[in-house]
C-alpha cells in the first residue's frame, strides 16, 4: 500500500491551476476581474493564437503597490478579505487570492504595474510560478502578459477545443463583462484584428445594443422590479426571438456572470414552451451577505440565501412580459386535436418497408408532435419533426448543392462578435453545403444563394444556431464531423415544427422518404424517430 505524503508545492500549484484555469478564456476572465476590481475605466485585451501564444490585458486602474506585487502571486494572497466576517459581505469580483497564483503556475507571466500614489512601478517576470526577474519601471495602470499558456501541462493543451472555439469563448467572456459594466470601455484584438471596440455608455440597454445590435435590442421587452434590498432588471425577448437553441440567456448576479438553471427554468415556466428557447438578460442586485459565490472554483455558480424570493420575482416579471405579448401557449401536450381535417384526420393508404404494401393502416395525432399509426400487428408512435429532420439531413448532405437558388436581394446578417468569428472561419463549409456566403465586414456576412430546400426558413436564426454548434466544437477539428453537425442544424431549421398542420398525403410521403434514409430510427442528433408496440405486448397490459 502506498504511504500518504504531502504534495510538493509545484504539484499543488498545478492542481489549483487546473481548477481555476480551464482554458485561455479562464485567464481572460480572471485578468478582467482584477482590472475591474482595480477601478479601471478602460480595459484592452490582446490575443495571439487563441490565447496559447499570448494573452495581454491592459487597464488604467489604480495599479498594485510595489511592496505587494510579489505577494500577489502567492497562494491565497488577497486584499479583499481580512477576517471571516469579510467573507460574508464580498463586493469585489476576486477574493480568494488564487487567480494570479494559478495563472503564473502554468505560464510565462510578466506584469508591469504602478500604484496610483507611487512615483515608480514594478515589472516582474515569472516562469511556471518561479520568479525570474524584478525591476523598477515608470508606467500607468497595469499590464499583464501571459505567454506559452500550459507550457508545463501539455495534457491540458490536448483537451482544448479548436482554435475558433477557444476564440469564441474568449469573445463571450469579454462580452459578458461588457454587458455587466457599461461604464467601462472594452476593446479586444485577436491576432491583431479588432474584434470588439465598446466605448462607455450610461445604460444597460445601450450596452446590449452595442454588443448585439439595435435591431435585436429593440425586440427585447424591459421590466425592473425592486423589493427590500433586491433589484432585478429583465430584458426578455418575445415570440419572434424564440430559438431552437439556447443562445442569449445571460444571468448576472451583483454584476458577475453566472449559471443558474433554476432561474432559467423559472422563465421557461412563464413561457409554457417545450421546444423553443427564449432569449433574455437578467441583472440581479442584492446585498453581498445574501449571496454566496464561494460555491464553484471559477465562481460560475451561486447560492442565494432566499432563492424563493428571487424565483417569485423573476416569474412574475416574465409572466407579465409573456402575457403582455400575448404569446402564452397551450400547455396540455396530450390533448387530442379535434381538427381531423389535417394530420389528425383518420386516413388510409399504402406505404412500404415497416408497412407492407398490401397493408391498410389508420393514423391520428396526439399532442402537437406525435402521430399514432395503426398497423395490423400493433401501433407506431412517430415524432414527425424528428422524421422530417432525418429526411432533410440526408438531402442536405447528399443533394443540397444541386438545386441552388440565387437570391434576388442578397441577405445581410448582422452577428454578435462571437458568432461572427465562428461563422467567418467556417464559410467554406457553408459554401460546400450550398449556402453561398461571404464576409461582409462589420460583424456581418452576406448570403447570396441558398439551396432550394431551405430558401424560406429563418436564415438569421439558422446562422446563429450554426455558430452555437461550432462553438461546442472538438479538440481536433474534423471537417466531415463539422459538416455533419452544420447539416443537422440546417435540417432542424428546415423541418416541420410541432403544431404545424400537414395532411395525410404529406404523412405518406414523409414515411416513404424516411424509409429510404440510412437511419430511419434516429434523427441527426441521435433522438428516436419512432417507437413500435406490438399487439401482443398491448394485450399483455390487459392480461390477455
From Swiss-Prot:
Keyword DNA damage carried by entry: yes
Residue ranges crossing the lipid bilayer per the database entry: none
Keywords: DNA damage, DNA repair
Family matches, as HAMAP family: DNA_mis_repair
The protein's name in its UniProt record: DNA mismatch repair protein MutL
Source species of the chain: Thermodesulfovibrio yellowstonii (strain ATCC 51303 / DSM 11347 / YP87)
One Pfam match: MutL_C
Entries under InterPro entries matching the protein: DNA_mismatch_repair_CS, DNA_mismatch_repair_MutL, DNA_mismatch_S5_2-like, HATPase_C_sf, MutL/Mlh/PMS, MutL/Mlh/Pms-like, MutL_C, MutL_C_dimsub
GO biological process, one term: mismatch repair
GO (cellular component) term, any one: mismatch repair complex
Record-stated family: Belongs to the DNA mismatch repair MutL/HexB family.
Function statement: This protein is involved in the repair of mismatches in DNA. It is required for dam-dependent methyl-directed DNA mismatch repair. May act as a 'molecular matchmaker', a protein that promotes the formation of a stable complex between two or more DNA-binding proteins in an ATP-dependent manner without itself being part of a final effector complex.
One MF term in the entry's GO annotations: mismatched DNA binding
